[in-house]
C-alpha cells in the first residue's frame, strides 16, 4: 500500500499522540493529519515539533462538527478514531458522553463515506464486554465468546453502541463507488508515560506522605503499555488495506493487550512507582460488598437530588466493579489476523513509565522547596 495517508482523531490525547508519533516512522506514509479539539501546552509543543516534518498536518476541530470532519477526511486512505470522552465515573453529563462517543463516531463514519475513505480503525474498550459483576471471574476472554456489557452508564453504553455502529458500517458503499472496511480494537487500561490516571494517582500519593491509596486491591487485570496499544492500531490500518489480510479483518473486533503481568491495579501503581519511595496504604479497607452498596446509596442520592442539585458521587458501582474484578483478555486473534506482537517488553515499559514518574516526584519536591523558601 505505497503512498497511503492517515487521519488520527483525538491526536492530543494519551493514545492518539503516541499513534501520531509512531506513524511518523512509517516510510510509505505520505501524510498524517492529526485532529484534536484541546490539549495542554506540552502536547501542543510536541505536535508542533512533529508538524515540522513534511508529512504531519495538525488540525484543530470538534468531533461533532460534520463539516470539519469532511474536510479532515478528504483525500485520506485511512482513519484511526481515538477521540472519546473517557468517563467511567460519569463526571460529564450523559448527553455529552453520548454525543462525543456515539454521535461523533457516526458523523465520522458518514464523513468517511462522503470523502471515500476506505479504511476505518476504531479505538474501543474492553468495557463494552464487561465486567458486569465483581463476583464474576473472567480469564483470557476471547472474541468468540461475544461478551457484552449490561451497564446502562453512559461511558460503557456509548462505547458499545459506537463499536456496533463501526462494525455494522463495514461494507458500506463509498461516494466514489469503493467500499468502506472497518474494524475495532478493544483496549484495557492503558498505562505509560503521560498517563493522566497514573499522574493523578502519583500526585495524590505525594500529598499523602507518598502513600498510594488502595482502590483496586481485589482486581486481576492485564493493562497494556501505550506504545503497544498504538502499535496495534498501525498494524490494523496496514492489514485492513492489505488485499490478502483484509477479508478476515473486515467487520471484526480484537482484544489488545501485551505481556504486562496480570495483577491488581493497586499492585501496578506500586510496581511502577516504588523506586521513588511510594508505597501502598497498609491500612484496613472496607469490604468490597459494603463499598458496592455504599456506591448504590450514593447513586440513589444523586438521582433524587437531580431536579435541584447536580451531585456527582466520588465513586459508583461501575467503578467499584471495574477496579475490583478478575477480568483478563487474550490477544491471540490479533496475533493471527493482524500479525500483532508487542513492540515493548514489560521490563522496558516498566522502566520508561517509572522514569517518567520520577520526573513527577522531582517536580513535586521542587514545588515544596520553593514554597518553603
UniProtKB/Swiss-Prot annotation:
UniProt pathway annotation: Steroid metabolism
GO BP annotations, alphabetical order: response to stilbenoid; steroid biosynthetic process
Domain of life: Eukaryota
Annotated binding of NADP(+), by residue: 10-15, 155, 159
Catalytic activity: a 3beta-hydroxysteroid + NADP(+) = a 3-oxosteroid + NADPH + H(+); 5alpha-androstane-3beta,17beta-diol + NADP(+) = 17beta-hydroxy-5alpha-androstan-3-one + NADPH + H(+)
Role description: Catalyzes the conversion of dihydrotestosterone to its inactive form 5alpha-androstanediol, that does not bind androgen receptor/AR. Does not function as an isomerase.
Transmembrane segments annotated in the record for this chain: 288-308
GO MF entry, a single one: 5-alpha-androstane-3-beta,17-beta-diol dehydrogenase (NADP+) activity
Keyword set includes NADP: yes
Family classification: Belongs to the 3-beta-HSD family.
Alphabetical list of InterPro entries matching this protein: 3Beta_OHSteriod_DH/Estase, Lipid_A_modif_metabolic_enz, NAD(P)-bd_dom_sf
Tissue-by-tissue expression: Expressed in the male liver, starting in late puberty.
Compartments, record wording: Endoplasmic reticulum membrane; Mitochondrion membrane
Recorded GO CC terms: endoplasmic reticulum membrane; mitochondrial inner membrane; mitochondrion
Name listed for the protein in its UniProt record: NADPH-dependent 3-keto-steroid reductase Hsd3b5
Amino acid at each position: 500500500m505505497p503512498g497511503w495517508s492517515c487521519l488520527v482523531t483525538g491526536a492530543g490525547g494519551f493514545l492518539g499522540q503516541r499513534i501520531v508519533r509512531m506513524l511518523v516512522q512509517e516510510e510509505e506514509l505520505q501524510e498524517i493529519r492529526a485532529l484534536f479539539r484541546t490539549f495542554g501546552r506540552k502536547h501542543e509543543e510536541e505536535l508542533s515539533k512533529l508538524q515540522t516534518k513534511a508529512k504531519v498536518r495538525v488540525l484543530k476541530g470538534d468531533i461533532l462538527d460534520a463539516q470539519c470532519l469532511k474536510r479532515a477526511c478528504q483525500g485520506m486512505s485511512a482513519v484511526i478514531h481515538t477521540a472519546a470522552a473517557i468517563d467511567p465515573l460519569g463526571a460529564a453529563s450523559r448527553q455529552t458522553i453520548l454525543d462525543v462517543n456515539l454521535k461523533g463516531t457516526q458523523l465520522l463514519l458518514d464523513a468517511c463515506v462522503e470523502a471515500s475513505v476506505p479504511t476505518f480503525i476504531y479505538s474501543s474498550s474492553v468495557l463494552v464486554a464487561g465486567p458486569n459483576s465483581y463476583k464474576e471471574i473472567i480469564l483470557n476472554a476471547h472474541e468468540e465468546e461475544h461478551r457484552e456489557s449490561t451497564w446502562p452508564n453512559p461511558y460503557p453504553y456509548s462505547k458499545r453502541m459506537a463499536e456496533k455502529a463501526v462494525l455494522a458500517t463495514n461494507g458500506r458503499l463509498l461516494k466514489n463507488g469503493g467500499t468502506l472496511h472497518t474494524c475495532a480494537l478493544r483496549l484495557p487500561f492503558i498505562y505509560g508515560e503521560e498517563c493522566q490516571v497514573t499522574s493523578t494517582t502519583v500526585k495524590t500519593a505525594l500529598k499523602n506522605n507518598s502513600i498510594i491509596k488502595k482502590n483496586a486491591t481485589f482486581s486481576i487485570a492485564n493493562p497494556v503499555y501505550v506504545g503497544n496499544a498504538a502499535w496495534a492500531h498501525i498494524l490494523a490500518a496496514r492489514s485492513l488495506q492489505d488485499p490478502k489480510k483484509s477479508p478476515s479483518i473486515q467487520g471484526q473486533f480484537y482484544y489488545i493487550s501485551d505481556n504486562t503481568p496480570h495483577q491488581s491495579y493497586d499492585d501496578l501503581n506500586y510496581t511502577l512507582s516504588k523506586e521513588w519511595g511510594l508505597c501502598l496504604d497498609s491500612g484496613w479497607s472496607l469490604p468490597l460488598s459494603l463499598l458496592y452498596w455504599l456506591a448504590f446509596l450514593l447513586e440513589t442520592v444523586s438521582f433524587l437530588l437531580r431536579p435541584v442539585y447536580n451531585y456527582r458521587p466520588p465513586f459508583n458501582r461501575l467503578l467499584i466493579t471495574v477496579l475490583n474484578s478478575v477480568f483478563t483478555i487474550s490477544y491471540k486473534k490479533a496475533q493471527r489476523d493482524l500479525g500483532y506482537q508487542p513492540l515493548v517488553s514489560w521490563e522496558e515499559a516498566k522502566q520508561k513509565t517509572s522514569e517518567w514518574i520520577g520526573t513527577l516526584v522531582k517536580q513535586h519536591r521542587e514545588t515544596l522547596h520553593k514554597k518553603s523558601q
